[in-house]
Amino acid sequence: MAEDTAETTPGVPERGRRRRKTAAEPAAPACAMSIHAHPDDQEFTVGGTLAKWARSGCRVITVCITSGGAGSNQSTPLDMTREALVPIREEEQRRACQALGISDVVFLGYEDGVLEPFIALRRDLTRIIRRYKPDAVVCGDPKVRFYGKGYMNHPDHRVAADVALDAVFPSAETRLIFPELLAEGLDPHHVKRVFIHGAPRPDAFVDISSTLDAKLAALREHKSQMGQWDPADMITAWAREQGKSRGLAAAEAYRLMVLEGP
């Protein structure tokens, strides 16, 4: 149900203010699947939402398409290898999920940094969706290449989002796409809602005021990526900016797709 709120223009009497409709926060799903390219992608973008849903009783499944083996930065030892980094990043992701209240974590094992929209990847994501049967899927926006003037969206992020959406529709709900999955006992599944973060014109907002601390705690578990940097100031500023249009102190914003049934 929409909430009717008044514009708070200083000096304008309440009866003279323009009124606008503010959509209510989307209800938490019973089961949600978060699909991203790397360990820490989820925590940067949607960690507050997932923590809030988990606290409400939602089962959340985290899917990392890669294990972040290319995630090096200035604090990474020069002798670090992909093979050594992968178990570190997987353990960091598990600890981050614990901070958010998530117990189901799946790593698909694709190579970090060179992700391509292979049919094998779509099949793997379709398999995971059919196995867990989420009511909602959370992913990025595959069309976003730039954020402002200072950040280029990682190509792995775009591929992960693109293939996740293709797995949701048509693959997960269409019986004769990947018929080999039927032999595994994985029948078609219809995902009811898709929450797309990073979209240019979001239309759904989740108040994360109560879970911002959990989001920050989860991010801090990614020690191999954070180094000595504390993300609190940046993440808090992002949450404040996303909530501003809805009068929220902290929010995560989405384009919400409500998908018609097959």
Task: Go through each PLM region and give its residues.
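Metal-dependent de-N-acetylase/amidase catalytic core
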Residues: A2-I35, D104, F118-P262
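Active-site rim/loop-helix segments in enzyme catalytic domains that contact anionic ligands
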Residues: A2-K133, R255
